[in-house]
């Protein structure tokens, strides 16, 4: 098996309104994904009218940022329990998770649900304590509550030893201590690259990919979002699509 050291696949999971989509916006801006004069709306990945109206993510969305020679594929998952299937779908695409928790509210019911799913898949986790700028922030207590949640979910010793990053996603700042944030998200990017492993695959194996979402474009027709597990996908190559129940 070979590893793609130039890639990272990560999902951002959290309870609703803990700042996932705001953090993705900041990561996109700071990675140079937009031109300085480009007019970009807030909540870039929220494309549905209901998502923008309610300020929530309903469907798992994907985007990517480039940091030096590394491409970071990011999946923004829903933060509401009613869309748990989308969370599970997103976790099949990644090799690690950014668990975002509000520095005041701490872990809430959906935090427990998404964390359980990530632990079941044995995905490495980076804890991001967001909104540390809030007047009622209680970062140290929240970290302890997250540790207790890991123990309550029967996480083993290796899973409990997770790195912690503190952030103010709206301001685009992060750091390794709640009272010492860098002027940008560099500490978060560095921790992500160090803690999330690169994907492994066998390029000599026949093509094997998992389709996680379908879409349509007026210009390109039907689109399939997939993760390549093994092999190589080449333009013009004939591909057989199979349902999971087909042997």
Identify the meaning behind each predicted range.
Residues 1-247:
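Structural and coupling elements of P-loop NTPases
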